[in-house]
């Protein structure tokens, strides 16, 4: 359902050389030596310039029904991931147990469906939000959601998890 690739040091260095926004975000995150606050992370992503063409040259997509996680950098305090979706691909309904998540929509339209659990522990949709390029979404745990690409084009989101995503719950829809 999900494919994961960690960028090689060479690809990451090439991306950082071509994409000042990504380089600056990594420098800021590395300078903290701690877990950044979600509000500040969202603010920084909101003003982050991303060289889309440079980023696209370093990303891959999966062709199955899932999505692709392109890990740019991971430390003990954060994980930066460019996630790609082809048309019709989505995540399972999930949470981020123990991690906060903020993401910037780089290309395409991202659809976030928010869920709450009913008495049977099944996920019931309560809200749907659409994000365009340049929009930022910041989700505190235990936010339960699904991200999907409901368009005919590709979708790229730049995610930062704090601390790195080490576990998550998967939920069945009601």
Predicted regions, residues:
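Short acidic-glycine-tyrosine-enriched beta hairpin
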Residues: 102, 117-144
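Conserved short histidine dyad/triad with adjacent acidic residue
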Residues: 81-96, 140-142
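Glycine- and acidic-residue-biased ligand/ion/polar-headgroup-sensing regions
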Residues: 87, 98-118
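A short glycine-rich, His/Asp/Glu-containing loop-to-beta-strand
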Residues: 57-89
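N-terminal leader/capping segments at the start of a protein or of a new domain
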Residues: 1-53
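A short hydrophobic beta-strand segment most commonly corresponding to one strand
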Residues: 102-103, 152-168
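Asparagine-centered strand-capping/turn motif at beta-strand->loop junctions
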Residues: 147-151
